[in-house]
A protein has these predicted regions:
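N-terminal cofactor/phosphate-binding cores enriched in small/glycine residues
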Residues: 88, 118, 122-124, 143
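Cleavable N-terminal signal peptides
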Residues: 15-16, 25
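N-terminal lobe/hinge region of extracytoplasmic solute-binding protein
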Residues: 27-118, 148, 155
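Bacterial N-terminal signal peptides that target proteins for export
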Residues: 2-14
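Surface-exposed binding/hinge segments that line
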Residues: 125, 160-182
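Short basic (Lys/Arg) and small-residue
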Residues: 130
């Protein structure tokens, strides 16, 4: 039984990275590994976020790593050092975690998630308003391309390990992608 929970936890971690999930079958705005999501569909902001916070200004991030220099902008390749926090600032995932809940993910790029009853697949429907920096819509094929890149030959083995339980990704239509699990 402990192994089952451990495996479910790691699959959930993949989900928050935009990769995978395990649960009963229904489409919902969020997925909770334990219990029900705290926030309802369409919630405006997390409770710990101040929507009236001042906007604008300058953000300075200081890396706590020994090295603060970089020689590449692709954080996924093996060779070189990427700037600190680059992945967090440039890339979005299908789901985003909540800081006031344990193991719960809410749709970020995904409008909803539907998990198969057998736990062997999860389908994500992308938000129509999900866009790249140039205004082009994020499509299911883009999500599949991201997965294929992360498990490809030029990517750090850490991503292949993280995604080892994912058998593959299928594009169901322009806005729907399905992750299949081993």
């Amino acid at each position: 039984m402990v192994q089952n929970y451990r495996m479910r936890f790691w699959k959930f971690c993949c989900l928050l990275a935009g990769a995978s999930v395990v649960a009963p079958a229904w489409a919902d705005h969020a997925y909770a590994l334990w219990g029900q999501p705290k926030y309802p569909q369409g919630f405006a902001h997390f409770d710990y976020v101040n929507p009236q916070a001042p906007k604008g200004g300058e953000l300075r991030l200081v890396s706590n790593l020994r090295t603060s220099t970089f020689d590449k902008y692709n954080p996924f390749t093996i060779k070189g050092s990427a700037p600190a926090y680059l992945s967090d600032l440039l890339f979005d995932s299908l789901l985003a975690g909540s800081m006031d809940e344990t193991a719960t993910g809410y749709g970020l790029l995904a409008e909803d998630v539907q998990v198969a009853a057998d736990g062997l697949s999860a389908s994500f429907r992308l938000r129509r308003e999900a866009r790249f920096h140039n205004g082009k819509p994020v499509l299911a094929q883009d999500v599949k391309h991201s997965f294929d890149t992360l498990v490809g030959p030029f990517t750090s083995p850490a991503y292949k390990t993280l995604l080892a339980e994912v058998a593959g990704v299928d594009v169901l239509d322009d806005r729907t992608v399905r992750y299949r699990f081993k």
